[in-house]
Swiss-Prot record:
Belongs to the UPF0416 family. This is UPF0416 protein RBE_1121. It comes from Rickettsia bellii (strain RML369-C). It comes from the Bacteria.
Amino acid sequence: MFSKMFNYFASSSKTHLDNTQESAINCGQHSAEAASYAVKTLPQILLGLITFKEISGSVMTGYAFGFALPEFAKVIVKSLASTIFFHPTASMVGTVAVTVAANSENVVECIKNTAHALYDAGSTVYEGTLCAVNGAAAAATFVYDNVCSTDVQLSGNAIEAVL
């Protein structure tokens, strides 16, 4: 039995086991790449939040252009503040648009790193699935090749009887 098992693993399932090993290695590599891109994305998000805070703070305090605004401009800023209070979603969209325009390099870098992270996460899932399928194929081939046909027939009849 052991020599038969050794010969089996040395020949027919070698391909399945090699594919399983290669898929596991690729899965690990893609996981590491996804993590590295996620780490690269975090500083970009932080820079975007800082820019958002600075722009929002400047507009709300009336020093949006580096100097104190005159009274008529303060009235406009106060009306904007009340608009922000009563329509927060629309105000957030506008502020985010200004932030993106002011900080476009970081936004592009963030989108690029996020896309890479998502691609590598998808590749990880694919390689993990491929690893599991190849492992199952190796096990199924081993069982099929090493179980006598009468045993297989008996187990098949037993399963049919239960169903």
